[in-house]
């Protein structure tokens, strides 16, 4: 998996965790609600966006966790399979090259295919 993909997944995970963490500090909660009200009065669609993000954040966290679990289960066997496929392809290529070199050497010594 690419580092950039992991970085994007990590950033999304951090954002969703921050947005979904309930505030235990009453002052922070009041400021958050005041900000949401002020933003929703200034730009109604932005307030709706904040509400939607707060609503969907737990589901996004759950989906990211499941995605990470699935990817980790799929990537490991795929890496092992690619490693063995590469090894098999290398061995086959070596065998073919060896056979061709032997045939060329025999043809050279005997004077060709006769």
UniProtKB/Swiss-Prot annotation:
Record keywords, A-Z? Antimicrobial, Secreted, Signal
Prodomain residues: 21-44
Q: Which GO terms describe its cellular component?
A: extracellular region
Q: Which domain of life is it from?
A: Eukaryota
Q: Where in the cell is it found?
A: Secreted
Tissue-level expression reads: Expressed by the venom gland.
Write the signal peptide boundaries.
1-20
Give the family, as the similarity comment puts it: Belongs to the formicidae venom precursor-01 superfamily.
Job of this protein? May have antimicrobial properties, like most ant linear peptides.
Q: This chain belongs to which protein, by name?
A: U-myrmeciitoxin(01)-Mg8a
Q: From which source organism is this entry?
A: Myrmecia gulosa (Red bulldog ant)
